[in-house]
Amino acid sequence: MDRPTTYPMDQPAGFRDAQGRHGGVVLPARPEPIALDPATTFLIVVDVQNAYASPGGYLDRAGFDVSGTGPVIARIARAVAAARAAGIPVLWFQNGWDPAYVEAGGPGSPNWHKSNALKTMRRNPEANTQLLAKGSWDYALVDALTPEPGDIVMGKPRYSGFYNTPLDSTLRARGVTTLVFTGIATNVCVESTLRDGFHREYFGIVLADATHQAGPESLHRAALANIETFFGWVSDVAAFESALGVPSRAPAGADLAG
């Protein structure tokens, strides 16, 4: 019986081909560096919608603090620019449902009971058709981030981007092995999608300073700890830019801690 292939512990993590070769870009990360090939990598921007990032959006109306999203959006823009410069495709997710909320599920769905957007609308019927409804301001991406021709924009009806979407087939058709995550919320849709990717054999990397949590900042830290311990790797935007050989677009004196 053939023994499984093993690699020296001082080599970076990451996908290797049949000859044991890893991607040529090595990204500093926790718990160890990870190698990637831009040709088999996607940048995933999760749910940077008015609902999750803007005053007056769903999270704000449901009582969550969105005051810290501005700097995160700026760092997401840097990650997107770096990916484009390196030839890495960008995929934008938008979470939400049809205006009649059929896609959200009725009382027979746990989503009906757990979705804070749906609960907020039940408490405030005047918000019906406003929160996370396709075509609404709430559903739209924030003005500061704009998909470009060649990007992929994909809707999703649940926290994980793999659930009831063509994400997996889209990635496999392109030979993708590695997913770099940014977006909102670290502890909900980002972590859910990265976890599902792990179970489908994708290498998942989250750029910590280009994500924002729903809830207290401790949930952001806990999600990152969970990811780096069990499901993936944690890096930051400056390291991503540097590894790709892309000039940093950080403003002078910016705090790049992740």
From Swiss-Prot:
Disulfide bonds: none annotated. Signal peptide: none annotated. Keywords: Hydrolase. It is an enzyme of class 3 (hydrolase). Its EC number is 3.5.1.110. SUPFAM superfamilies: Isochorismatase-like hydrolases. This is Ureidoacrylate amidohydrolase RutB.
